[in-house]
Amino acid sequence: MLHSVKALRGSAIVAQDERFGFVVDLYFDDRTWTLRYVVLDTGRPMPQRSVLLEPASIASIDPGGTLSVRLARKQIEKKPDWLAERPVYLQHDMTPTGHRGDGHLRSSEIVMGCSVQALDGSLGHVADLLLDERDWTLPCIVIDTGHWLPGRRVRVAAASVGEIDWIGRKVHLALEREAILAPV
């Protein structure tokens, strides 16, 4: 089932033993468009902390957006506060063996709002990403076409993204505007 990443932000996290925190962001690999971490704000009653949950720890996402995880509260509490220093997507990604990775970890929050360029001109901006809970991929981006097709949102395969200019906040598609017609 596909889930709106935008709608998941702010969703409750239900641990094995109780409701615990909420989703702040989702981090993904910008080469494979695969979810790497769900950023959880633990909220109250303990001091506010941000921890990372791997997709393997997610048991399910209910239709209302609540994420049930395969961890108990104590297991989540033991996770380090990864965002205390700076956002993870600005750090070099660490591999499971603890070695420095290649830095392709990106924040879904940063992607949303980026302008979108088709091969033949401006298309609009990224309004949302869609998450497939079967394989934890982000197969589609949702584009608000803005002035080009007022009031329309279109779904485009993430595989059609040719390049992302993170500094200029532009997503370049390997498609022409006319090839993008499927409304969401």
Regions found by a protein language model. Give the residues of each.
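Peripheral interaction segments used for macromolecular assembly
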Residues: 1-184
